[in-house]
Amino acid sequence: MGLIVFLTIGIVFLLIGLTANNANDSIKKKKAIASFYDLKATSIEGEEISFDQFKGKKVLIVNTASSCGYTYQYEGLQKLHTLYGKDVVVLGFPANDFLFQERGSDADIADFCEKNYGVTFQMFSKITTKGRNQSPVYSWLTNKDLNGWNEKKPTWNFCKYLVDENGDLIAFFDKTVKPLSKEITSLF
C-alpha cells in the first residue's frame, strides 16, 4: 500500500513538472538566423515599410480581422500602442485566413479600424498568414530555420508574436491572450 502511494505521488509530481515545462514553450530567447530587420511589408496605405526602422524597439505583430469574435482586441492593441508606443511598436496584419472574417479591401479595413477603434498603430495591407501564399513576415515568424525557434502558426485571428529590440522573436501568444495582459506587458 505504501509503495502504491509513493509511486502515485511521484507520478503526479512528474506530470506537474512536464506541464510546467510546456507552459514556457511559447516564450523563448534564441538568436534569429535570418534578420527580422531585412523584412519589408506594404502598409495599408500602399507604402513599402522596411522593418529596419524598428531597430531598438520591441515589436508586437498581430494577425487581425474585422468580423471576428476577437475583433474587440483592436481596442487593447490601440491602448497598448498609446501606453507603450515609445518602446513598443504594434503592427497589425489583416488576414482573411479563418472563416473569411476579413473580406474588405484595405481601404474598408482602414476605415473600419479608425471609425470603430481609433487605430493609429501601423496597419498593413491584407496578407496570408499560412499556406502557399504566406507572407514573408509570417514565413519568418513561423519558421524556426529563420527565427531561431518558433514554428507556431496562427491558430486564429489575433495571435501575437513579440520580437525584442535586437530583432529576435521572443514569444508567441494565442488569440485568447489580450494585448494588455501581464503575459505580454511583463516582457516590455
Regions found by a protein language model. Name each.
Residues 57-58, 67, 71-96, 114-117:
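Conserved helix-turn-beta segment immediately C-terminal to the redox Cys motif
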Residues 1-38:
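N-terminal targeting signals for export/organelle localization
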Residues 107-156:
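Short, internal strand/loop/helix patches
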